[in-house]
């Protein structure tokens, strides 16, 4: 009978309308799962299924992955290329550490020179300026002494020219001899000379006082 559910007949209209969307949903889910399964399968399987050789590129991919893993990942037996790279990197790191240490040393020396050396050099420069001033005064003193000595030599030369120079031994010989008075002649009278005026000389004490006092140059 139409509309009876227990006899295995057709469902009522309301139940039939609810059952149709559920069936469509089930069919849609099954289609999605099958489609995802087909998309999850590798491209080599599709091409292999088409060409008749399933998974022909899989060994090649595995070998490539193993080669990259051997190069990049550490293993029990390191390859020569990896060992050479490690050695070069260690050498490079050592040189970088040495360079950084040298830079630190230079930075420390520069700061030491700026903080201690420059003030010391400035103080020495001021002291050298004082020494140069003393040297200038000493040179002026030497020139003054040279001028005084030159004037003294001129006066000595002039006195020798006026008084004459006679050997001392010959003078003694003449004093011991008795010459008759008739042979003696009156010595011509010499003109009276002016008195000797000693030149003005410097005093060393004025320029070089005692050791207890500081020299005044």
UniProtKB/Swiss-Prot annotation:
This is Biogenesis of lysosome-related organelles complex 1 subunit 4. It is found in: Cytoplasm. It comes from Homo sapiens (Human). The keyword Phosphoprotein applies. GO terms for biological process: anterograde axonal transport; anterograde synaptic vesicle transport; melanosome organization; neuromuscular process controlling balance; neuron projection development; platelet aggregation. GO terms for cellular component: axon cytoplasm; BLOC-1 complex; cytoplasm; cytosol. Residues 29-41 have a biased composition (Polar residues). Component of the BLOC-1 complex, a complex that is required for normal biogenesis of lysosome-related organelles (LRO), such as platelet dense granules and melanosomes. In concert with the AP-3 complex, the BLOC-1 complex is required to target membrane protein cargos into vesicles assembled at cell bodies for delivery into neurites and nerve terminals. The BLOC-1 complex, in association with SNARE proteins, is also proposed to be involved in neurite extension. Plays a role in intracellular vesicle trafficking. Keywords: Coiled coil, Cytoplasm, Phosphoprotein. Residues 1-57 are annotated as: Disordered. The modification Phosphothreonine is found at residue 165. Interacts with BLOC1S5 and BLOC1S6. Component of the biogenesis of lysosome-related organelles complex 1 (BLOC-1) composed of BLOC1S1, BLOC1S2, BLOC1S3, BLOC1S4, BLOC1S5, BLOC1S6, DTNBP1/BLOC1S7 and SNAPIN/BLOC1S8. Octamer composed of one copy each BLOC1S1, BLOC1S2, BLOC1S3, BLOC1S4, BLOC1S5, BLOC1S6, DTNBP1/BLOC1S7 and SNAPIN/BLOC1S8. The BLOC-1 complex associates with the AP-3 protein complex and membrane protein cargos. The keyword Cytoplasm applies. Belongs to the BLOC1S4 family. The gene is BLOC1S4. Its main location: cytoplasm. Residues 136-165 form a coiled coil. It comes from the Eukaryota.
């Amino acid at each position: 009978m139409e509309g009876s559910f227990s006899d295995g007949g057709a469902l009522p209209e309301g139940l039939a309308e609810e059952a149709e969307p559920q069936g469509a949903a089930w069919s849609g889910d099954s289609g999605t799962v099958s489609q995802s399964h087909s998309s999850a399968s590798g491209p080599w399987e599709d091409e292999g299924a088409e060409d008749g050789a399933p998974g022909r590129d899989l060994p090649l991919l595995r070998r490539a992955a193993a080669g990259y893993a051997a190069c990049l990942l550490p293993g029990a037996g390191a390859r020569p290329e990896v060992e050479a790279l490690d050695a070069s990197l260690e050498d490079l790191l050592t040189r970088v550490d040495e360079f950084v240490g040298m830079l630190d040393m230079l930075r420390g020396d520069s700061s030491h020179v700026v903080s201690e050396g420059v003030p010391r050099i400035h103080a020495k420069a001021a002291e050298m300026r004082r020494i140069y001033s003393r040297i200038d005064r000493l040179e002026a003193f030497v020139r003054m002494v040279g001028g005084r000595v030159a004037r003294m030599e001129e006066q000595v030369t002039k006195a020798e020219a006026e008084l004459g120079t006679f050997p001392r031994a010959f003078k003694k010989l003449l004093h011991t001899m008795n010459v008759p008075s008739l042979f003696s002649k009156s010595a011509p009278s010499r003109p009276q000379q002016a008195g000797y005026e000693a030149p003005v000389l410097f005093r060393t004490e004025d320029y070089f006082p005692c050791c207890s006092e500081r020299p005044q140059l």
